[in-house]
Amino acid sequence: MLMETLSRWIGGVNDVLWTYVLVAALLGCAVWFTLRTRGVQFRLLGEMMRVLGESAGSGPKGERHVSSFQAFAVSLASRLGTGKLAGVATAIVVGGPGAVFWMWVIALVGAASAFVESTLAQLYKRRGRDSFIGGPAYYMERGLGRRWMGVLFAVLISVTFGFAFNSVQSNTICAAWEGAFGADRVWAGVVLTALTLLIIFGGIRRIARVSGVIVPIMALGYIVLALGVVLFNLGRLPEVLELIVADAFGWEQTLGGAVGAALMQGIKRGLFSNEAGMGSAPNVAATAHVSHPVKQGLIQTLGVFTDTLVICTCTAFIILFGGVPDASLNGIQLTQAALESEIGPAGGVFVAVAIFLFAFSSIIGNYYYGEANIRFITPRPWALTLYRLLVGAMVLFGALATLDLAWSLADVTMALMTLCNLAAIVLLGRQAFLLLADYTAQKRQGIKNPVFTKDRIPELKDKAECW
């Protein structure tokens, strides 16, 4: 009885936060930042690709740092969870094909928020024991002078990503492998937990190396498969694109209220998927060794595009080419059924393997978000060790448990975390605009590789510890 009451209460809070408050706040900030940066996500798309190719730098002792690409891979690892396979399917079932169009829109506009938060994370980063550290908690303390706000954010993100989200990813992996291969959930959970602990106890550089290998392989593999499905159904591509656009704006949908459903589902799933403005990706953006803070802003903007415009679109095409979505199937089952209809029984096996790669990479990416914030709360080594062990325990717990209540609670903490971050980046946004102006000014002067030092912008001189 108590659990039912608690579940209903949490569900009510979620409805208010996600239907009204959070969607309005995220959209409003995304549009504002797009206007203030003059569409940085569109103007500097070519520069994003150039920066992504930069190699790791060397520090004063010659040690290797986290490169732009590795930071991109870790943040993309967290974004590329099972939501890419299940979340898009759910959006299509609930909101119709038109939800895909609104996911595209929110990615294009929301990318500006990702640029601002990651640029600020670079500006306010600090030197850690084995890498740079930073993120929203750090710019809340140093930029706004409000440590309490940083601690609140740090607690929320550590619980949300390290515990709740990782439990869900673990649960999805073990359920998929049990269904596809008959794997015992207990042993699957033990193996998954051991792999997780092995990697996270190696620190950010091991996490970056593993992500730098897994993410390109799984993303490219999934894209190649999706392209194969598209080529096989090339004659139907205009029909599917027309279906997406018509369902987003058609008269039938308008009269039936379906446009509103498509809009809400597309926005909610898009925001949840690409994390723009949530305050998660800046934690890893701060670790990169770059010559100018704007570079990581550009890299993380590209991450939003890769996540939604590429990976999520692949899933949408696979499902829509498979026919009318079956509302009786859940997200993962729908994607699996759609693939099986295209390539036969091998599709189910591919989904099981893809789920493992997507979800496992997400687990280690999510963990690092928590690590950066545990270090903000306290520098004591035992606290980080305890957190790592608790993350491992939650991965094992997730493999064996049902997680409906935990997932609903995570939605609440994630919403509060996001609102906290949005308030901070709106207040500090002008500093990101100044950095962008400095970067583009250097490019106009013919400088191929812009460099930032704190004396270039007097207003930021006391803010930049590492510049």
Task: Give the residues covered by each predicted segment.
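Extracellular loop-to-transmembrane helix junctions
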Residues: 11-50, 93-130, 306-312, 412-422
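Extracellular/periplasmic helix-exit of transmembrane alpha-helices
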Residues: 115-124, 129, 225-243, 257, ...
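Membrane-interface loop-to-helix entry segments
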Residues: 25-32, 37-49, 171-177, 184-232, ...
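Helix-loop-helix module between adjacent transmembrane segments
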Residues: 29-34, 106-130, 136-137, 141-171, ...
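N-terminal alpha-helical transmembrane segments of multi-pass membrane transport
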Residues: 1-82, 93-98, 426-467
